[in-house]
Structures are given as C-alpha cells and as structure tokens.
Amino acid sequence: MLSRKRKHGSPDAESNPSKKQITSLRSSPRRTTRQKENIPISLNSPQKIPSTPKKTQRAFLLESPPKRVSPRKAVLGAGTFYSKQKPLYLTPLERKVLKEAKSPPSVTNKEPSRPPLTAANQVVKPAKKVQKKPRASAPQSNLKGYFTAKPKATKSSSDKQTDQVLKSTMAPISFSSMKSKGKPKLVVGAAFFNTGKKPTSMYKKSAQNTKPKPTYEKPSIRKPVREKELVTAPGQRSPVRRAVFLKKQPEVEVSHDKRESTQAPMSPQVLADVHGITKELRVVLRRSVSPETGSQDAPSEADSVFDVSDLLLPDHDSSHDEEESSVYPIFGTKRPQKKGKLSPPLNSSTPSALTATPALKAKERSMLRREMKKQTDNQLIIDAGQKQFGATTCASCGMLYSTDSPEDNFQHTQFHQRFLDTIKFVGWKKERVVAEFWDGKIILVLPDDPKYATRKAEDVRRIADSELGFQQITLSSPSSAKTYLFINTDRMVVGCLVAENIRQAYRVLEQQEKQKDMSKEDFMEHHRTWCCSTVPEKALCGVSRIWVFSLMRRKSVATRLLDTARNTFMYGSHLTKEEIAFSDPTPQGKLFATKYCQTPTFLVYNFIS
C-alpha cells in the first residue's frame, strides 16, 4: 500500500486550491498529535472523513475492494502522510552529493553518517531530536542543513577524547531484558593519544605479566651454596658440638670431601649401621654437659661417636631446618619430636629411659583425671528457674537446708522457731553479770537461782547438746554446775559454758605429727580417737560443755567464756590452765583446747563417770 502511494507529485500539485483544502483538512489532526507519529499504528491509512463510506467486510478473499466515492482523493501525494517539519529522508543522489561535498580532513571530527530513514528507522528514532531541528519542506534544504555550522559549546580536543572514551567504556544498563551484561573494561593505551592503533584492555595486559618465565639455571647455581650452609649449620646451633669438634675438624673435612666426591644418597640408617652407633647415642652426646671429660675417659668411643654425629647431623637435621625455616616455628613437625627427645634427664643413656618418661607422664595425667572425676558431684536437682536453688544457710538460726525440698523446709521452720525462742533473752530483774564487753556481756546462772533463770539455762544446754552430738543425760553433779551465758547486743544467747567441780583428770598423750596426704583419709586425722594416760592428775574445774552459735564463731566468744570461768569459778582464786580439764572433746573442741592451753597434752575427764 505504501510503495504504490509514495510518488512525488507535480510541481503545481501543491498550488492547486482544491488540494490545499484537502491537505489542510487532513494535516490538521496530524499536527495536533505529532508526538505519536513513531507508533506503528499511525503509519496506516489517514483518518477517514464523514464523506467516506464505511468499509464493508468482504464475503470472499478474491472479491475486489469497493471503489472510492470521489476520484480526486486518489491524486494525494505520499508527503501528506508525514509531518512536513521532518524531511530527513535523503535520496541516493543527495547522499552522494553530501559525501563528495564534505572535506576529507573533517572525517575524524564529523558525526557518524545517518542511515536512510525508512518506516522502521522512524519508529526507533526519538521524538526529541525532531523538535530541535526544524527544516524546510523542500528537499534541497536538507543539503544546506548539513553544511551550516551549528553553534556548540567550546571544548578542547582532550575533553572530546576523554568524553568519547568514557562513552565507550560505560556499559549499557538494561532493566527489561534478563541477560547479564559483562563488566566494563578500562581502555588504556593509544586511545588517549589520538593514534590509529587499536586500544588494549588493562585486564589483558595484567594477565600476561603474571606468568613468569621459567628459569632452570638457578637450582644448579644455589646447590653448592646450600651444601656449604649445611656443613656450618650444626656448629652454629649446638655449642656442645662446636666445643668438641674443634679437635677433629680436619677429619670432618675429609669425610665431607668424600661425600661430595661420591654424592651417593645414603640414609641415616645406613650410616648408623656402617659405624655401629644408634640414634640414641647421638642424642645423649647432644645433651651432655661436660663433653670434654667424656672424651678423656673413653677416647676410642668418643671418636667414633663424634664421626657419626658429624655425618648424620648435617645431612639430616640441618636439611630439615633449612626446609622448615620458611615456615613459622609453631607449625613445624620436627620441633615437637626434638622436644620429646630432649626431655629425659642428662644421666640417662639407655633407650628404655628415653621412652619411659612419656609413659610416666601419661600415667600421671590419667590419675589426675580420675581424681578430678571423683571430686566432681553429680547434679541431682533440676534447675527449673527457682528463686532459691540448692543448699541455703539460714542467717538467723544457721541451719543448712535445701529450699526446694518440702521436708527440709518443714524441718527448718520447726527448728528455726524453737531455736529463736530458746536463744532469745528478754532480761531478768536480778542478772548476775560477771563480765562485760563492747559486743555483749556474760551472765552466770547458779542452781539456786529462780526457775526462769535455771529453765533458760537448761534450754540453751539442750541446744548445745544437740549440736555437739551428746545424748540428753543429766550432769554428774547438777547441784554444783555453773552455767555461763554470753549475751550479745541484740539480746541473743550466742555462747554457753557449763563448768563443774572435779578432783582429777588425765593428760592426753602426744602423738607424732605425720605429713598429711589430702588425697587419702589423713585429712580426717582430727576426727580420730585420742588416747590419754592412766596416771591421774589434780584438776579443780571441769568444762562439761562449751558451745558457740555458728554465726558468731571466730570472734573470741569461747575464749572470753573460759577466761571468765577461770576467774569466777572459785571465790577468791584464779585458776591456771593446768587446773582445768575438758570432758570428751569433739574434734573442734580438741583443736580449741590445744590452742587455748598452748599444748596438745591438755587434761581431759569423763563427765559421765
């Protein structure tokens, strides 16, 4: 349809008045929608006017189209279908004239040649460029438009070159397609200097330089130098070998020369078999403190040993050290082996002694692990987020109990109330105060005192008996017993001492002190039975009970109670430490009596008899 209608009209076609009316009617709707001319739908036949009849659908494919009503409408030119402000289409003759008219020097700076405008090219071309370049309707104006110089911003040649390079290096970004674009390459080389050479990529150039040329002459040159270092290395590492090998230096050089001449690879085992010396002898010589005395005692053995050590060490140890010198010391595999070899003592020269030390260490480690496992306690209580978890000591009564056990809580409640009621001291009208201190006072209770006083003393004695482990038995002479109570500033009974009259006592036999082994049962030594002599000694005051509240211990409460009892037990006399005796002391009481009397041979008596 388009190829048949694209005919140039006659020169007077545009001057025809009838055509002017038709073109004005046809072009007016096209000019209002100039920006939609790139849409392919706009290239179809022009909009029909009301005078044109509607197209009827064909019944058959071979049926001819209906004839037009007016014969004048067939004379319309192809230019009426396009905007007259875009005469960008150039005929082949115009393109040839344009190419010949332009000068050759301006080829490098001219813009790229524009392709002929077809229907497809007009669709792709953006509409913004069309509005910037209004042209005349005549085709000759196209040539003038190309030759006229356009006003542009002044830019230097270097700026233009850099702009071209940046435009070429920028990678196109596409969001509609799913294909991934390659990374942009930085172009370096001749493109910056405006030469005709092809630009090269920076990445290709660096990849070519990374391959070094193989050199085969360096190993042969460094080989004799390394052998010289291996010979001198043992003397630098071990001061023992340096001191001993000074005497036999010529022999070492001869053997080294022989080895260089033969250059036969011999393993350390073969060399050891040839000289008849094992590896352990070499290690012992390295560990020896006085090599000169050993060489003087056995010169023949020392010579043979030194030869083998000189042959083996440069070949074996130094080569490994040279290879491992490039590795950080802690990552080497040779050093832990050397440390294990040097661990035995200096005087051990047998292979069994060298291997026995690691076994003993392993056995000791296993024993330590077993002991640690025995000491660890198993968890028998589930931690479910309780506020109070595990064993707890009451701050008031001092009882140790488990808070998450109902039975322990019940027992603690009963004991706590009974204990507080017992040790609470409300005060009496007639108090027999025998001593006063900054943190409390000591009250003496006699058997002839009122009932409230004797009842209070009896209650405190029962608590003391329960904590000390005694049975609830009566005193041997209750009529002569005296009770001393220590009352603190909070008006609580925190200490009790029961003293009675005695006539004789027995001295504890002194036992030899042994070194205690805490891993065995010796840590229970103070819980063991004690022995006393059968020879009675004279004593006047017997300490039947002495008890201190658990939360008030280590505050000299028992010492002050005993000092007060010595001063007030007998009227008008002060008893010495040799005149008092303790009745069947507990382990803690034995320690206290030894410290108080300043001797382990203190006096004891049995309060039951």
From Swiss-Prot:
InterPro entries: AcTrfase_ESCO_Znf_dom, ESCO_Acetyltransf_dom. Its EC number is 2.3.1.-. Residues 126-135 have a biased composition (Basic residues). Belongs to the acetyltransferase family. ECO subfamily. This is N-acetyltransferase ESCO2. Residues 1-71, 100-165, 197-241, 314-357 are annotated as: Disordered. A zinc finger (CCHH-type) spans 392-416. Keywords: Acyltransferase, Cell cycle, Chromosome, Metal-binding, Nucleus, Transferase, Zinc, Zinc-finger. One of its GO terms (biological process) is heart development. It comes from Danio rerio. It is found in: Nucleus; Chromosome. One of its GO terms (cellular component) is nucleus. Acetyltransferase required for the establishment of sister chromatid cohesion. Couples the processes of cohesion and DNA replication to ensure that only sister chromatids become paired together. Essential for early development. Residues 214-230 have a biased composition (Basic and acidic residues). One of its GO terms (molecular function) is protein-lysine-acetyltransferase activity. It catalyses: L-lysyl-[protein] + acetyl-CoA = N(6)-acetyl-L-lysyl-[protein] + CoA + H(+). Residues 13-22, 41-54, 345-355 have a biased composition (Polar residues). The N-terminal region seems to be responsible for association with chromosomes, thus excluding any involvement of the Zn finger in this process. Its main location: nucleus.
